[in-house]
UniProtKB/Swiss-Prot annotation:
The lineage of its organism: Eukaryota, Viridiplantae, Streptophyta, Embryophyta, Tracheophyta. Belongs to the eukaryotic ribosomal protein eL31 family. Pfam families: Ribosomal_L31e. Keywords: Ribonucleoprotein, Ribosomal protein. The keyword Ribosomal protein applies. GO terms for cellular component: cytosolic large ribosomal subunit. The keyword Transmembrane does not apply. This is Large ribosomal subunit protein eL31. PANTHER family: 60S RIBOSOMAL PROTEIN L31.
Length: 120
C-alpha cells in the first residue's frame, strides 16, 4: 500500500537528461528551428519536473543558438534543478532552472537520467 502524504513532486531535486531535439523538431520550418527548440526544452522540463515556472540559463540559450537558427544540435545534455521560490508574491512554490550539462568525451551514447545529490 502506498502511503498518502508528501508528494515527491514537492521536493527539491536535480537531474540530468539527454533531450533528443531532432525528434521534437522533425518537420519544423528551417527559420523556426532554434525558437521551437527553446520551447521544446521548456516543455520537456515542465513535464519532467512537474513545475509550470521553468527558467532557462543563458548558456543553454547560447548552446541552442550556437550554430544558427537552422542548425540546432540533434541532442543536448541538460541539468534540470527544481528549487523553492522564495518570493512572497510568487504564484508557484517551486520553479525549475535548466542549464547545460557537461558531455563526456565518449559522447551521449548510453547516458540515461542521472540524479544529482545536492551539497547544501
Amino acid at each position: 500500500m502506498v502511503e498518502k502524504g508528501k508528494s515527491r513532486r514537492n521536493e527539491v531535486a536535480t537531474r540530468e537528461y539527454t533531450i533528443n531535439l531532432h525528434r521534437r523538431l522533425h518537420g519544423c520550418t528551417f527559420k523556426k528551428m532554434a525558437p521551437k527548440a527553446v520551447k521544446e526544452i521548456r516543455k520537456f522540463a515542465q513535464k519532467a519536473m512537474g513545475t509550470t515556472d521553468v527558467r532557462l540559463d543563458v548558456k543553454l540559450n547560447k548552446a541552442v543558438w550556437s550554430r544558427g537558427i537552422r542548425s540546432v544540435p540533434r541532442r543536448m545534455r541538460v541539468r534540470i534543478s527544481r528549487k523553492r521560490n522564495d518570493e512572497e508574491d510568487a504564484k508557484d512554490e517551486l520553479y525549475s532552472i535548466v542549464t547545460v550539462a557537461e558531455v563526456p568525451p565518449e559522447g551521449l551514447t548510453g547516458l540515461g537520467t542521472k540524479i544529482i545529490e545536492e551539497e547544501d
